[in-house]
């Protein structure tokens, strides 16, 4: 899924560039792509910008991130799969020195560069290890500032590998990772404005990647919606996608996955409702945070000189988590 909008100022003024990435999110999850999940901020961006119906990335998160930041095939950047070193040129598990990142290029052009959220482009993802090779960490690959996690998925309440710049940091009481990413990104917007520098901001949410961790106030809004079951929900999504022009009318709804029973035959339906509601709440919370970032751009007078790009890294997750 990709969503882009741009409204740039004078030709001589360098635009801010803000890239926002969701993690393991399905094509039709958000409202402007047919989903029942409430995403008003993304929907407004879609209405005022460019909504893609054909957009390609890789099937795993690390290769997509490598390609996005370097403009290369992931193997050329050294991340042909995940972050395990397979001792093959294209599968070293972290960014190599034969590639240049967007941050490195934009920094040389006077941009202030910041990465917030999930990194997942280094084999050495423990910030407490003083001897760790930091050559593929954000600050060593062109970013002036970093707050987030070096590894992939993990707890939203106490994430592993939480890092500020090159040093470990801790989750305070009441910490929720999606909110922390949003707050930090909004602060970066305000800081860059005070510095009078164009901004390159890479915001990489972990939502809605497993584990299913959400706040009760968000989950409560979705239980009734998902009580109708996945068969009715997927039919409704399909109909909305046709109405939005995302798919052709002659493209019929695909059969339900053989591994998934009909909703009326599903065991533990209350538990299934809860799972779907929590997943939706994770995306809802991310959209709320995107609203905070947009508001910071608006308050600083930078919104009309900012190119915004929203995408997901690899589509919905098909893994079964025990």
Predicted regions and their residues:
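Formylglycine-dependent sulfatase
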Residues: 1-322
């Amino acid at each position: 899924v990709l969503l882009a909008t741009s409204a740039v100022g004078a030709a001589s003024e360098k635009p801010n560039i803000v890239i926002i990435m969701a993690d393991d999110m399905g094509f039709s999850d958000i409202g402007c792509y047919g989903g029942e999940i409430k995403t008003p901020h993304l929907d407004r961006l879609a209405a005022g910008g460019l909504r893609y119906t054909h957009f390609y990335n890789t099937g795993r998160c690390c290769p997509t991130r490598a390609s996005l930041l370097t403009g290369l095939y992931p193997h050329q950047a050294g991340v042909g799969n995940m972050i395990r070193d397979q001792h093959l040129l294209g599968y070293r598990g972290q960014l190599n020195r034969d590639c240049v990142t967007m941050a490195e290029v934009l920094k040389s052009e006077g941009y202030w560069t910041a990465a917030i959220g999930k990194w997942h482009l280094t084999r050495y993802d423990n910030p407490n290890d003083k001897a760790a090779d930091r050559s593929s960490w954000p600050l060593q690959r062109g970013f002036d500032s970093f707050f987030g996690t070096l590894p992939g998925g993990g707890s939203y309440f106490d994430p592993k590998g939480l890092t500020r710049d090159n040093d470990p940091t801790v989750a305070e009481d009441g910490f929720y990772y999606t909110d922390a990413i949003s707050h930090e990104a909004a602060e970066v917007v305000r800081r860059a404005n005070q510095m009078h520098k164009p901004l390159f901001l890479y915001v990489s949410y972990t939502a809605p990647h497993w584990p299913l961790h959400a706040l009760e106030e968000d989950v409560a809004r979705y239980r009734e919606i998902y009580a109708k079951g996945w068969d009715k929900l997927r039919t409704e999504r399909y109909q909305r996608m046709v109405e939005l022009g995302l798919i052709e009318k002659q493209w019929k709804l695909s059969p339900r996955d053989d591994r998934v029973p009909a909703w009326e035959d599903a065991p533990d339906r209350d538990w299934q409702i809860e799972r779907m509601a929590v997943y939706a709440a994770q995306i809802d919370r991310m959209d709320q945070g995107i609203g905070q970032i947009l508001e910071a751009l608006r308050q600083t007078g930078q919104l009309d000189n900012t190119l915004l790009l929203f995408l997901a890294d690899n589509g919905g997750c098909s893994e079964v988590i025990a």
